[in-house]
Amino acid sequence: MDIKDYVINIAKNSKLAAKKLSYADTNTKNKALIEMSKALLENKDYILSQNKIDIENAEKIGTSKALIDRLTLNDKRITDMAEALIKTSSLQDPIGEVIKMWKTPDELQIGQMRVPLGVIGIIYEARPNVTVDAAALCIKSGNSVILRGGKEAINSNTAIAKIIKNAVVTAGLPDGSIEFIDITDRETVNVMMRLNGLIDVLIPRGGAGLIKSVVENSSVPVIETGTGNCHVYVDKYADFDKAERIIINAKLQRPAVCNAMESLLVHKDVAHEFLPRISSKLKELKVQIRGCAATQKIVKDIVPATDEDFGKEFLDLILSVKVVDSLEEAIDHIFKYSTKHSEAIITENYTNAQRFLKEVDAAAVYVNASTRFTDGEQFGFGGEIGISTQKLHARGPMGLEQLTTTKYVIYGDGQIRK
């Protein structure tokens, strides 16, 4: 069987499963999630052994430490994945929820009801936890899912997918509810992008290159999970202690994720006082600073920033820094370079905070908090399938509700249109 036929067969199985999943009862879906959780814990050693192979392969080709961190599983991360499944099982089922209902002059009772999207294709790279997170949210929201991970994590993903696929069938959901493409050839993605009628939506999760390729080449509708060139702006009215805590957290907690800070903007009135303080701390923590001309005059021994640096998602211990003359210049800089993911202002000035919130165009805009909070779990959604940076259908962390659409249900009593 060639690659095209292989992917089409998987999509057909997923389409059949999606029909049954669309009306599966909540108890069965929750049981499937609980069985998935148990199966992960019972097979922890096997998963770790397969993950070890992926890590060794990554190290052989010189993969960065930050990306290896995204790839790595350990006891705690698998336990966290299992616990997240239990949490998802406890969330309210969105399917069948009537968002609003009204009566027309013709005495028709009309309701707007949540329903699944159908078949969701997830194309992702080096994070094995996505295999579980995506499957869990799709199952709970009544969607079937086709998972296509990257070659970096193929052994980990294959092991996890086999385990959770068997678990959902054991729980009583149809075979095909979770499908996994175990061929890493790029052609599998090309086929998925052309399967209109079999796949309802594609969600790419990964680097800028992957996302751009899917968005530009897919005829199947795409929800774009954007890259994160996230900014923190230190206003002239900033509390320096707050600013330091937020910057250290936003840059260093997990530098290789999309909600990590990549660029620091500092108002000129506080730059001479604040930049030496924060740069000293960042250098201690092994962060490379790439600064504008004004920054270079204040902080010695840093790398000159290029225009490209200000638009780049580093996913590493690298930070671009720019001194700005005003709040307006900070907002304009963000407008020019932002990927519209997460942006933050540090200020004690209410007027400046409100202006930043109103004028900055991003999925999440913060006042005095870390960009690292842009996350489905942190927002109270119980996990996410990705963070959308587009404006149609969904924006920001995509939880269960964002994996649904609606239909109108109409109750009549013999009415005809006159």
Swiss-Prot record:
Cross-referenced InterPro entries: Ald_DH/histidinol_DH, Ald_DH_C, Ald_DH_N, Aldehyde_DH_dom, G-glutamylP_reductase_CS, Glu-5-SA_DH, GPR_dom
PROSITE patterns: PROA
Pathway given in the UniProt record: Amino-acid biosynthesis; L-proline biosynthesis; L-glutamate 5-semialdehyde from L-glutamate: step 2/2
Signal sequence, start to end: none
Family of the protein in this entry: Belongs to the gamma-glutamyl phosphate reductase family.
NCBIfam families recorded: PRK00197.1, proA
Name used for this protein in its record: Gamma-glutamyl phosphate reductase
Organism: Clostridium acetobutylicum (strain ATCC 824 / DSM 792 / JCM 1419 / IAM 19013 / LMG 5710 / NBRC 13948 / NRRL B-527 / VKM B-1787 / 2291 / W)
Gene for this chain: proA
